[in-house]
Curated annotation (Swiss-Prot):
HAMAP family: PNPase (MF_01595). It catalyses: RNA(n+1) + phosphate = RNA(n) + a ribonucleoside 5'-diphosphate. It holds the Pfam family RNase_PH_C. Its main location: cytoplasm. Residues 621-689 form the S1 motif domain. Its EC number is 2.7.7.8. It comes from Aeromonas hydrophila subsp. hydrophila (strain ATCC 7966 / DSM 30187 / BCRC 13018 / CCUG 14551 / JCM 1027 / KCTC 2358 / NCIMB 9240 / NCTC 8049). Component of the RNA degradosome, which is a multiprotein complex involved in RNA processing and mRNA degradation. Its cofactor is Mg(2+). Belongs to the polyribonucleotide nucleotidyltransferase family. This is Polyribonucleotide nucleotidyltransferase. Mg(2+) binds at D485, D491. One of its GO terms (cellular component) is cytosol. It is found in: Cytoplasm.
């Protein structure tokens, strides 16, 4: 294939698509560049589906190479290893909008690999990778209902900004990524600084309008490439099987889906399914058990969806806007710094907040360099929470994604480092799950942070909305169950305060989600959120005035930046001895800020006292109480402050004539001395005889402190 190149303007950036040069054995390959950020995306699809497979095996791998930023990886092996959290999140960002566009019944394995090969620090590669995945699928010939476009939307000074740069984004009140086709939005992922529903909806619409430039360019690019579509046809519907399953199961399934308790309902449905499979096979319908099971699932979907659209009660008897029963408790773990147990129906999260010092911050190694994250939120979804057994180990993609969503929901209300100098880690342990565990994590996180005494700006709650859309109409559902999520058309999660939205995530399985539907969903979500916040406020209305007795207290003092070296000492000897002897953690910034962290208040006071002594300036004419540390023929050296010695000349020991210094002083003597002079070289002249003159003020007592070991 000859190289084919397509360039177009996308907001403030120039985007170039190129194929036909690299990876020519892949089904499709596209190099996408946006102002020097280059992502190489390949697609490989198997021509035949594996026998017996009943699911669509789509894999998306996004990977960053450090050479893209002119760096060599750290670590012993000096090469990239397992995917980072950021890479995992972007893999999900690519996967979510493309997955619904593969036709039902297409079960051939497809793998999308996006590799960042060059990075401009001002241009984030995630949007570039999403555009590349869309372009590669569009020219692959694989059955795909795209292309899609992708856009990042910021909100600055009351205006929407298309694809803000990495330097602009910190000043933006919004970081929203939206993806969709020419006619519909498919995916939204966002974090906001407590914005109104109207602003959030406007951002989605703005992003969808702007991404049309991408969709049009990819269509033109695909036409230039001219790949022939695969010769694939959807499997025919077995009408006889469909009718037989409906005949045998409709009535019983209808009753089963009135059972409110999840475990009992699942057990009942499982028994119905086993009987139906057996009866269908016995009736002579030519299909295997797997196909019968698929048709049984389709019938389940039709029953649940039809009931909702007709205005009948939902699976657990609720109406569309009703929230499940709520239960909130704080301070449930005696030794944790902050804890909360949040229960909504059959979804439950035990959320724990821990306070740490600056050294506990997570060091994140990114393409453009390292950064420290002072707020971490981790989400764990063990198999027991859904009554199952399973492998336990490192977090899976879903857990990483849900944790990040919950973090986005809470981040807007977190205090700055100046307001609260602690590093904070929140862990959400999902102990029960039947829908919307990520939003339970948002609610639990807000409660646990308040219980820990973190001065968050406001309480935050989250709610998951669903949608059932049929030809005869649509219904938006509040606080969806797991089954409603699985059988519905939309997963729409909103987190926020009483004032506005802090996070919005939307995944849509069908085309045709209109602005009207999103508007209704946001309005309904606001009502649900306010209801949940009211219940949460009954448990705890404001952050606790004091942090836990088991949390470290952080005390902050300022010293002269030139004195930092004195506190650290040679090879770190002084600060190491300080931390070991006082039992504190001590951190220093280049501007002279010193943070002392200790659970024991007296230990912190002792560390502060000793640091102040180390960094104190010697004052002329002041009287100090010091210790004799060395004798010489011409006088004695007295330590008056940690690391600071002065000379008492032989003539300044007493009014009488002194022949031998040792006759008057010995090493270890504690004496009063007056500072006569500090010369330009920092040498200190002291006097014992003037310090003992009757008109002088009381002596400043010597301060015991860590001294840097003398050089041998």
């Amino acid at each position: 294939m000859n190289p084919i190149v397509k360039s177009f303007q996308y907001g403030q950036h120039t985007v170039t698509l190129e194929t036909g040069v690299m990876a020519r054995q892949a089904t499709a390959a596209v190099m996408v560049s946006m102002d020097d950020t280059c992502v190489f995306v390949t697609v490989v699809g198997k021509k035949e589906a594996d026998h017996g497979r009943d699911f669509f095996p789509l894999t998306v791998n996004y990977q960053e190479r450090t050479y893209a930023a002119g760096r060599i990886p750290g670590g012993f092996f000096r090469r990239e290893g397992r995917p980072s959290e950021g890479e995992t999140l972007i893999s999900r960002l690519i996967d979510r909008p493309i997955r619904p566009l593969f036709p039902e019944g297409f079960l051939n394995e497809v793998q999308v690999v996006a590799t960042v090969m060059s990075v401009n620090p001002a241009v984030s590669p995630d949007i570039v990778a999403m555009i590349g995945a869309s372009a590669a699928l569009a020219i692959s010939g694989i059955p795909f209902g795209g292309p899609i476009g992708a856009a990042r939307v910021g909100y600055m000074n009351g205006q929407y900004v298309l694809n803000p740069t990495t330097t602009e984004l910190p000043q933006s009140d919004l970081d929203l990524v939206v993806a969709g086709t020419a006619n519909a939005v498919l995916m939204v992922e966002s974090e906001a600084a407590i914005l109104s529903e109207e602003v959030m909806l406007g951002a989605v619409v703005f992003g969808h309008e702007q991404m049309q430039a991408v969709i049009n360019a990819i269509n033109e690019f695909a036409a230039d490439v001219g790949t022939k579509p695969w010769n694939w046809t959807a499997p025919a519907v077995n009408e006889a099987l469909k009718a037989k399953v409906a005949e045998l199961a409709t009535a019983e399934l209808g009753e089963a889906y009135r059972i409110t308790e999840k475990a009992v309902r699942y057990e009942t449905i499982g028994a119905i399914k086993a009987r139906v499979v057996e009866q269908v096979i016995a009736s002579g319908v030519e299909e295997d058990a797997k196909k019968i099971g698929e048709e049984f699932h389709s019938l389940e979907s039709r029953i649940v969806r039809g009931r909702v659209v007709r205005g009948e009660p939902r699976i657990d008897g609720r109406d569309p806007e009703m929230i499940r029963a709520l239960s909130v408790a704080t301070g449930v773990l005696p030794r944790a710094h902050g804890s909360a147990l949040f229960t909504r129906g059959e979804t439950q999260a035990m959320v724990v907040a821990t306070l740490g010092t600056e050294r506990d911050a997570q060091n994140i190694d990114e393409l453009t360099g390292n950064r420290a994250d002072r707020f971490m939120l981790h989400y764990n979804f063990p198999p027991y929470c859904v009554g199952e057994t399973g492998m336990m180990g490192s977090p899976k993609r879903r857990e990483i994604g849900h944790g990040r969503l919950a973090k986005r929901g809470v981040a807007a209300v977190m205090p700055s480092a100046d307001e609260f100098p602690y590093v904070v880690r929140v862990v959400s342990e999902i102990t029960e799950s039947n829908g919307s565990s990520s939003m339970a994590s948002v609610c639990g996180s807000s409660l646990a942070l308040m219980d820990a005494g973190v001065p968050i700006k406001a309480s935050v709650a989250g709610i998951a909305m669903g949608l059932v859309k049929e030809e005869e109409g649509f219904v938006v559902l509040s606080d969806i169950l797991g089954d409603e999520d699985h059988l519905g058309d939309m997963d729409f999660k909103v987190a926020g305060t009483t004032e506005g939205v802090t996070a919005l995530q939307m995944d849509i399985k069908i085309e045709g989600i209109t602005k009207e539907i999103m508007e209704i969903a946001l309005k309904q979500a606001r009502g649900a959120r306010l209801h949940i916040l009211k219940v949460m406020d009954e448990a705890i209305q404001a952050p606790r005035a004091e942090i836990s007795d088991f949390a470290p207290r952080i005390h902050t003092i300022k010293i002269n930046p030139e004195k930092i070296k004195d506190v650290i000492g040679k090879g770190g000897s002084v600060i190491r001895a300080l931390t070991e002897e006082t039992g504190t953690n001590i951190e220093l910034d280049d501007d002279g800020t010193v943070r002392i962290a200790a659970v024991d208040g007296d230990a912190a006071k002792e560390a502060i006292r000793r640091i102040e002594a180390i960094t104190a300036e010697i004052e002329v004419n002041r009287i100090y109480e010091g210790k004799v540390v060395r004798l010489a023929d011409f006088g004695a050296f007295v330590n008056i402050l940690p690391g600071k010695d002065g000379l008492v000349h032989i003539s300044q020991i007493t009014d009488a004539r002194v022949q031998n210094v040792a006759d008057y002083l010995k090493i270890g003597d504690v004496v009063k001395v007056k500072v006569l002079e500090v010369d330009r070289q920092g040498r200190v002249r002291l006097s014992i005889k003037e310090a003992n003159a009757p008109t002088e003020a009381a002596a400043e007592p010597a301060v015991a402190a860590v001294e840097e070991p003398a050089a041998e």
